[in-house]
C-alpha cells in the first residue's frame, strides 16, 4: 500500500479510536463513564446509567427502541439532543465500536495489517496469538473484504481486544453467525472486561447469557430495567426476552 493510502487509512481510523473533544463530554475521576439525562429526538428520553470497570452490559429491547442510537452517542458519532456523558479522565482513548456495517471498518489490504493499524505498540507475537485464537491465522494475508461474515466479526473483535481503550461497544456482534463463531466471539468479549467495560446491543439471549453480567432493557424510549445478572439468572433473561417479543 502506498504511503498516502496509509495516511488516509489512519485518518479514517481516528474516527473510530481517538480522543475527540465534544461539548457534552465531561472528564472526571470516576469509573469508565456515567450517562446523565441523555435524550435524542423522539427515540431516547432521559437515559441514566453508569458503566463500571468489569461490566459486560447487554443492551436489549425491540427493533427501533434506540440501542444503536445510544451506542453511537457513546461513541460520539451523533450528538444527543439533551444530557451529558461523564467520562473517566484516565480513559486511554475513545470507545471502540464494532458496528453491523462491517466493511466500513476495514481500511487496509490484509487481515494482519488491520490488527496493526492504530496498534503500533502491539507486537507481532501478540497479533499472531490473537489470529490463531480466533482461527484467522490462515487468512492473515487476505483482504478483509474477502472474509466471510463470521470471519469479519472475529477480526473486528480481535482488533478491539488489542486496542488501547477501556470501553468496548458492540452492535449485534453475533448477527448471522453460527454457534461456533458465536462461542469464539463470546469468549473473547468476556476477556475484554479485564481491560475495562463492554456494552453489547443484542437480540440473542443465549449470547447475552454467555457474556453479560448486567442487562439494560430499553422500552418506550427509556430504561425499563437495569439488572445485575448472576449465573442462575437464565430464567430472568427468558422473561425479559418474552416481554420484548410481546
Feature-to-residue mapping (PLM):
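ABC-family nucleotide-binding domains
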Residues: 178
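ABC ATPase C-loop
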Residues: 160-161
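Conserved ABC ATPase "signature" region
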Residues: 124-139
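Conserved beta-strand-loop-alpha-helix hinge in the C-terminal portion
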Residues: 1-12, 222-245
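Catalytic Walker B motif of ABC-type/P-loop ATPase nucleotide-binding domains
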Residues: 168-172
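Helix-to-loop junction immediately C-terminal to a conserved catalytic motif
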Residues: 75
Amino acid at each position: 500500500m502506498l504511503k498516502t493510502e496509509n495516511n488516509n487509512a489512519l485518518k479514517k481510523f481516528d474516527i473510530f479510536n481517538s480522543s475527540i473533544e465534544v461539548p457534552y463530554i465531561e472528564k472526571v475521576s470516576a469509573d469508565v463513564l456515567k450517562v446523565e439525562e441523555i435524550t435524542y429526538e423522539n427515540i431516547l428520553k432521559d437515559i441514566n446509567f453508569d458503566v463500571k470497570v468489569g461490566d459486560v452490559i447487554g443492551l436489549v429491547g425491540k427493533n427501533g427502541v434506540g440501542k444503536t442510537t445510544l451506542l453511537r452517542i457513546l461513541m460520539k458519532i451523533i450528538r444527543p439532543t439533551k444530557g451529558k456523558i461523564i467520562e473517566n479522565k484516565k480513559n486511554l482513548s475513545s470507545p471502540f465500536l464494532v458496528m453491523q456495517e462491517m466493511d466500513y471498518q476495514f481500511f487496509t489490504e490484509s487481515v494482519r495489517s488491520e490488527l496493526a493499524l492504530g496498534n503500533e505498540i502491539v507486537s507481532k507475537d501478540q497479533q499472531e496469538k490473537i489470529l490463531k485464537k480466533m482461527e484467522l491465522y490462515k487468512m492473515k494475508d487476505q483482504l478483509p473484504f474477502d472474509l466471510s461474515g463470521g470471519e469479519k466479526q472475529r477480526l473486528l473483535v480481535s482488533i478491539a481486544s488489542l486496542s488501547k481503550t477501556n470501553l468496548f461497544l458492540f452492535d449485534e456482534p453475533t448477527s448471522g453467525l453460527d454457534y461456533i463463531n458465536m462461542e469464539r466471539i463470546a469468549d473473547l468479549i468476556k476477556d475484554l472486561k479485564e481491560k475495562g467495560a463492554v456494552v453489547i446491543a443484542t437480540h440473542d439471549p443465549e449470547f447475552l447469557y454467555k457474556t453479560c453480567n448486567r442487562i439494560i432493557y430499553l422500552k418506550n424510549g427509556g430504561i425499563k430495567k437495569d439488572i445485575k445478572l448472576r449465573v442462575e439468572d437464565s430464567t430472568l433473561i427468558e422473561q425479559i426476552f418474552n416481554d420484548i417479543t410481546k
